[in-house]
Structures are given as C-alpha cells and as structure tokens.
Regions:
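Exported/periplasmic ABC-transporter solute-binding proteins
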Residues: 1-171
Length: 171
C-alpha cells in the first residue's frame, strides 16, 4: 500500500523486512498484534475490536467517517466480482447486498456502505439456486450476516461463504 514494493530495473521487488510475520487471516493478525506490544498489522475497519487499537495516520483516526471522506489514507474497498455467466440467484444476492437493506447490514457491522442513495431490495420472483461466495477473511463476517438476512427473504436460495485470505486473489 505504501512503498512496500520498489522498482528495481524492470521488476517490482517486495521490500517487506525478512523479520516480518506474515499471516493469512484477520483473526491471526489480531491475535498476533494483541500479544506483542511492538507489533503492527492491518485489518479491515469492520474487524476492529477492543483487543487492538487503530493507528492514527497523519493524526487522523480510523473511523467510518474519516475513511468515507478520504481523510484516513489507508483504505481499500471490498469488491464483488462475478462471472460472465452469473446465475439469477447470484444476481439477486448481489442486488440484495447493494440495496439499502444490504447496505444497512454493512454499516451496522462497522464496515463502510457503498451508496447512501441505495434503494430498498425488491425480491425477484422464482429465484433459486446455489451461490458460492469466496473471499478474504476480512469480508467473511459481514458476508455471513448478509447471507443470513438474504436467506430470510429468499428461502429458495442457498448461499455458501468460503473464507480465504487477501493474498489468494481472484481467478
């Protein structure tokens, strides 16, 4: 995010110190940082709890408002990517997530909602099927809440949330 990679010749080189501990999950990061007063790590704002504290950047606290107004400089969005052959069930689930109903869940769980002007969810008739959502441990807690709420309004759908880590990337 901030100068970890440097250009050397024609390639980028990761300049992370060899003394760094690199984890593959939010919970491991939080446990590691909580147990070592000299440790620092990064997690999603929605994962922040009282076991660790957020670092001020240029004197700015990590809050939803400060991330939303771009005054807190370390932030990344959660992206929802789908296949070209997206099923009706997947489209409907994404519509739910992006609706005011879904965005309220996002906001209520300490994450940053996408749009203040999102419209209420309108259920599509006859939508059924399985949707597999794979993503970072950063997004899993809120995705589980979104899944639970969506299944309450569409009992014919099946949502499977698979947790990985941010380094896995997308295929």
């Amino acid at each position: 995010l901030f100068g970890i990679e440097e250009k050397q010749g024609d390639e980028k080189v990761d300049m992370t110190t060899e003394d760094a501990s690199i984890t593959n999950s939010t919970s491991v990061m939080m446990t590691t940082v909580a147990g070592d007063e000299n440790a620092i790590g990064y997690i999603s704002l929605g994962s922040l709890d009282d076991t660790v504290k957020a670092v001020k950047i240029d004197g700015v606290e990590a809050t939803v408002d400060n991330v939303s107004n771009d005054s807190y400089k370390i932030a990344r969005p959660f992206n929802i990517l789908t296949s070209d052959k997206e099923s009706d069930a997947a489209k409907d689930f994404v519509n739910y997530i992006m609706s005011s109903d879904g965005q309220k869940i996002v906001e209520d769980n300490g994450y940053i909602k996408e749009a203040a002007d999102a419209k209420a969810y309108e259920a599509a008739d006859g939508v059924s099927g399985k949707v597999v959502v794979a993503g970072s441990s950063s997004v899993t807690p809120v995705m589980e809440k979104l899944k639970e709420a969506y299944l309450a309004v569409n009992k014919d759908a099946e949502i499977e949330v698979q947790e990985s880590d941010s380094t896995t990337g997308m295929t």
